[in-house]
Swiss-Prot record:
Entry keyword annotation includes Ligase: yes
Description of how the protein assembles with itself and partners: Homodimer.
Record lineage: Bacteria, Bacillati, Bacillota, Bacilli, Bacillales
Protein name: Adenylosuccinate synthetase
UniProt function note: Plays an important role in the de novo pathway of purine nucleotide biosynthesis. Catalyzes the first committed step in the biosynthesis of AMP from IMP.
Cofactor entry: Mg(2+)
Matches recorded under NCBIfam families: PRK01117.1, purA
Amino acid sequence: MSSIVVVGTQWGDEGKGKITDFLAEQADVIARFSGGNNAGHTIQFGGETYKLHLVPSGIFYKDKLAVIGNGVVVDPVALLKELDGLNERGISTDNLRISNRAQVILPYHLAQDEYEERRRGDNKIGTTKKGIGPAYVDKAQRIGIRMADLLEKETFERRLKENIEYKNAYFKGMFNETCPTFDEIFDEYYAAGQRLKDYVTDTAKILDDANVADEKVLFEGAQGVMLDIDHGTYPFVTSSNPVAGNVTVGTGVGPTSVSKVIGVCKSYTSRVGDGPFPTELFDEDGHHIREVGREYGTTTGRPRRVGWFDSVVLRHSRRVSGITDLSINSIDVLTGLDTVKICTAYELDGEKITEYPANLDQLRRCKPIFEELPGWTEDITGCRSLDELPENARNYLERISELCGVHISIFSVGPDREQTNLLEQLW
């Protein structure tokens, strides 16, 4: 099996969906391995814009399988809404497969997410309140309900009653709140499971069959390395592992199956939610990037925080995800800026450091050390090779590659599929 993993190298929203869609044309199977509908992928082609949250980007290719792996947490009601929306626009979803071992998000997870954020007050994480974190907590506590359980009426009924009893005690003690009732959950979610029944299967077997048949598999990451619960800006992170290594756990394939890891980044940096952000901008350059780049969350609609490109972050992501190739998106967004900056290191308590601190208080004290490069004014949205880019834009990309220690295999100069340029064959 030849396989490629696509991961975000920043705090998510790097354009992974577009790159996955671009690479999916040559793949046989496209599989998601982590996260839930807190993720948001925007894909544009043929003059149409599609916003996905749970459905893998490969859904648009009828002859390829789009897999939701066991490491994904699935809100069945939200998933059906997404599938219905695609069907209404003439997109077939018959090629979708959902792991029977994927955990199910239920209304009490959404309630718990809301209550937890309220309890934290000024120390809130800034979650999307989609129930992702509480679902992963239940998984770790071994009380989670999986897709296989949802499909069996007696199993689902028994497990749901047990969990509601537990959640009621927990909600009362922690938040002075009550859990959604059995009657408020059971019928709707069991019916949702029955509608999804034909999609649910042992997806690890599908991927193993692809391996035996020497097919091409594309693994689609969600969020980004800096949101990884182990390697990100903890505790301002997601509740799963977006790093490439989680492909093995989140889909059931062996670690020797991975051939390449494509690290996706923007030509600048953005993040949604709270937490340290060393290169964050609050000036006119930041306003330019946010408005030209349309930096508003796909899932939440919230304005994203934006900042200059941070090579400290990228080097960290390269190391913990084993990144072999770099895909740089949204280069066109920087057009028109007199000067563009790259963070090369941090200053911490008067000392220069080049590695990302694990301690949050230290990270908050870090000041970015910038290298300034001249900007460009030329329209680059039609450029199809590095040689076609203005010299200043080309120098900017080459400097990023040099600082991060990874060569560039893909660059993008606009939101459409046709504006994504491959510099070398990856399969």
